[in-house]
């Protein structure tokens, strides 16, 4: 059993916590989150980025984690970056709270997300269906108001 956490902070009012849990390398990873400070009633892009480097804010986290060199997609797509977690949905207070299971995201094994960065974006992820090159790369999710490095937890 492996558990990890990322505490999201940034240059904005957006903050939160994302937890990850995986029983074995072949099992899905359970991802839970509570993120506040977003716009009310919005979808906000939610991704694992390649680097655990936040020295220049969330920009230093690099591109989406993509060890298999796929195009950007939705979490349910086979053709997607490992780091493509889709969107979180905010309530009337701008809080996003939820959970999901993901077979591509791993805490255990060669393509672990440990030491990488979770980013919450300022815009909605179009899930690679935006009809332009940037959509196939980033989902046109926009700026990075908050992020956190994924570290082991108890």
UniProtKB/Swiss-Prot annotation:
InterPro entries: SOD-like_Cu/Zn_dom_sf, SOD_Cu/Zn_/chaperone, SOD_Cu/Zn_BS, SOD_Cu_Zn_dom
Keyword NAD: no
Cell compartment(s), UniProt: Cytoplasm
Alphabetic keyword roster: Antioxidant, Copper, Cytoplasm, Disulfide bond, Metal-binding, Oxidoreductase, Zinc
Matching Gene3D superfamilies: Superoxide dismutase, copper/zinc binding domain
Binding site for Cu cation: 47, 49, 64, 121
Gene Ontology CC entries for this record: cytosol; mitochondrial intermembrane space; nucleus; superoxide dismutase complex
EC identifiers of the protein: 1.15.1.1
GO MF: copper ion binding; oxidoreductase activity, acting on a sulfur group of donors, oxygen as acceptor; superoxide dismutase activity
Gene Ontology biological process terms from the UniProt entry: cell redox homeostasis; copper ion transport; fungal-type cell wall organization; intracellular copper ion homeostasis; intracellular zinc ion homeostasis; negative regulation of cellular respiration; positive regulation of transcription by RNA polymerase II; protein stabilization
Transmembrane domains' residue ranges: none
Disulphide bond pairs: 58-147
Domain of life of the source: Eukaryota
Positions contributing to substrate binding: 144
Cofactor annotation comment: Binds 1 copper ion per subunit. Binds 1 zinc ion per subunit.
Subunit-structure text: Homodimer.
Function according to Swiss-Prot or TrEMBL: Destroys radicals which are normally produced within the cells and which are toxic to biological systems.
Family: Belongs to the Cu-Zn superoxide dismutase family.
Name of the protein in its database record: Superoxide dismutase [Cu-Zn] 1
Organism: Debaryomyces hansenii (strain ATCC 36239 / CBS 767 / BCRC 21394 / JCM 1990 / NBRC 0083 / IGC 2968) (Yeast)
Gene name per UniProt: SOD1
